[in-house]
A protein has these predicted regions:
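Local cysteine-cluster metal-coordination motifs and their immediate loop/turn environment
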Residues: 40-59, 86-107
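Ferredoxin-type iron-sulfur electron-transfer modules in oxidoreductases and energy-metabolism complexes
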Residues: 20-37, 59-91, 108-131
Length: 139
């Protein structure tokens, strides 16, 4: 997939005529190829400002790097170290004013779609439960 590093990989959405007839999510999210292409736009900054904008301090460069490499299990593990609700946060967290708002890529072009990548990782883990390690109860 050809990637313009200044532009986000577009996210697929329901056609407006179809979505007017249902209550399904409008945004379909990324598929594997789209997620890897979007992740390849990340500059993997040493002093990652995106992490400073994340209220739960997810190691964003590390999980995005794993998405770029196609290791979605590792990406999920990294996100899960800080967030118990990645599928929710990937949908409702105001990324444009938090992590994506601090993304260096956004100074010239579009910031990396961190929220959409988080959503992709969480949805992929949920669809493939074998990717998720569930710890034994502690009590």
């Amino acid at each position: 997939m050809e990637v313009d590093v200044l532009k986000r990989v577009p996210v697929r959405e329901q056609d407006p005529k179809v979505r007017a007839t249902n209550f399904e999510e409008v945004c379909y999210g990324y598929n594997k190829e789209e997620a890897m292409a979007e992740a390849s736009r990340c500059l993997n900054c040493k002093n990652a400002q995106c992490m400073k904008g994340c209220p739960v301090s997810i190691n964003i460069p590390a999980f995005v790097e794993q998405v770029k490499n196609g290791d979605f299990t590792k990406a999920y593990e990294i996100i899960s170290e800080s967030s118990a609700l990645p599928a929710v946060c990937g949908r409702v967290c105001p990324q444009e004013s938090q992590c994506e708002g601090k993304c260096i890529r956004g100074f010239k072009g579009d910031p990396v779609s961190i929220g959409k990548l988080e959503r992709f990782v969480a949805d992929t883990a949920r669809e493939n439960l074998s990717l998720i390690h569930i710890s034994e109860p502690t009590r």
